[in-house]
Amino acid sequence: MLRFDVVVVGGGHAGIEACLACARTGHPTLLITQKIEQIGHMSCNPAVGGLAKGHLVKEIDVLGGEMAKATDETGIQFRRLNDTRGPAVRSSRAQVDRQEYRSRMKRTVENQEDLSIQEATVEEILIHRDQVIGVKTDSDETVLTKALILAPGTFMNGLIHIGLTHFSAGRMGDPASIGLSESLKRLGFRMGRLKTGTTPRLDRHSIDFTQLTRQFGDEPPLPFSFSTEKIETEQLPCYITYTNIRTHEIIRSGLDRSPLYCGVIKGIGPRYCPSIEDKVVRFADKKRHQIFLEPDGRKTTEVYPNGISTSLPQDVQTRMLRSIKGLEQVEIIRPGYAIEYDFVDPTELKPSLETKKIRGLFHAGQINGTSGYEEAGAQGLMAGINASLYVRGERPLILKRSDAYIGVLIDDLVTKGTAEPYRMFTSRAEYRLHLREDNADLRLREMGYEVGLVNEKDYRIFLEKRMAIENTLSRISSLRVNPTKENNEILHQWGSATLKKDSSLREILKRPEIHFKNLFDFDRSLEGIPESIQEQVEIQVKYDGYIKRQMEQIDRFKRLEDVSFPEEFDFGSVIGLTTEVMEKLKKIKPHSLGQASRISGVTPAALSILMVNLKKQGYL
């Protein structure tokens, strides 16, 4: 009988980060996956990052995760979105080579010390006295474990739809996991049904690219990982085209065979990534919808048409695509499809991602109702870290909303739950000026080092960078510029007001039209400062007042977060709460007064009652 400290079920983006985190912190770990060759497979688009998602990938990286490094090594196009806007909403995105990304992740998992892999399907979770003790596989083998992380993606009772044809599958070409879902139901977990979809895959040779608009990556490309010095790979272009009125007519003509509009699909789909048939029906006044043709890799003819996810019958998909400019002769390699799958209500979880019902059982990824590789990877990493800490009998690592987008993601899930596939946006983060991509290492690298996932070399580089930022800020604060004719001429050529008195370089940099590079004219020695330091210093100086106000908000918020409820606290015994508030508190079981304050319906008066009760019982 096999025994491991941690067992991880599922070799997708959540499962990879989870098993690597456990093994890298010295715990013998087993990854159970249906097909070893599918470890790290990108089931949908061949891309990482995007608005707010790029923030998650950077945070995964500085905490010691793998996604950013793999993206830098296998990327084929890199772009920074919202580059002309403020630093809070700038986000990185990369097209990757789908096959290379999968191979890179598979190699990493296979070569990781303390990590074993088994090809199997988990049929049952084994429990003793409300604590996980192991799993049983489809070969009737029992594997014992101290902690179990479930990261099954869309595989639990997965059902694929193409037109009115449907069949059981976890994704195209892979069987669904039936037993695991049934096992969770028997354990009494609240479960629901969600739906997602993907686009048809196209043959590159059948596309007329001369009719399409090319979209290039940024030069030079900016890496995702703080450990990557630079990216030297040749970038590939993407192409842009649009649907048209004829396309929309074809789509409408096929709605009588659409599983979405015939009531066949019961699961709730992603609000922010609707199918093309959903777009045409919901936005009937729009004459066209944008499509990005994204190469699947360097050595494949497969093309991913981003923006045209569909579950229409294949004949309708073909006619629809051939009505689009540049795709008049297109051949479909694989049709688009929708997939329904089971998920567990994430309010069943503690902020550590451990379930409230079963000790030692953790959930990560789409099982929690999220969509996206990045959201999955973030949860997998945190589940892995906290499973390791659980095995060692230590307190979990819980990122606050003011610490990271990962903290926002998990807090939203465990506090509010979700009725539709959840995706991250910058608008979900109330402290987004503090939670920027550029300062992810300054916010979280120390934590990654403390939990044992950041190596000495990367930690030393981080310390040197932090010191360089502090030294540069000190330097430009002390260097003075006199209001001489020569200096004022320099300012005039930049379109900046002349000086009337001595000013520091820091004061000059505060001006919106001045950038760090402009300071070189006053002090040539600044030219040797790395660009990453220049960018960080410029942001900190220009947004100093806003950042200070946000940090004051965070301090006020922290006072509520620091008031914790003990595990045994009985919300049902608190006198003075309304029935509605009491029921919600008993369901969510918030870990802190801060989390309680974010539960719908919990009023300031209710928070005061809880505070008084904590004091009465001697917890404060």
Regions from the PLM with identified roles:
Residues E37, E182-T318, T415-N488, H492-L499, ...:
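An anion/pyrophosphate-binding glycine-rich loop and adjacent beta-alpha core
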Residues V9, T142-G153:
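Short hydrophobic core segments
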Residues L2-A14:
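Beta1/beta-strand and adjacent pyrophosphate-binding region of the FAD-binding site
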Residues R428, H434, R445-A606, V612-L620:
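Extended, charge-enriched "interface" segments that sit outside catalytic cores
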Residues L126-T142:
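Conserved beta-strand-loop-beta-strand element in the redox core of flavoprotein oxidoreductases
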Residues L2-F4, D138-A147:
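Core beta-strand elements of the Rossmann-like FAD/NAD(P) dinucleotide-binding domain
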Residues Y304-T370, I398-D411, P530-K584, K589:
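A glycine-rich dinucleotide-binding beta-alpha-beta segment and adjacent secondary-structure elements
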Residues L20-E124, A151-R171, P175, G179-S181, ...:
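Conserved N-terminal/central alpha/beta ligand/cofactor-binding core
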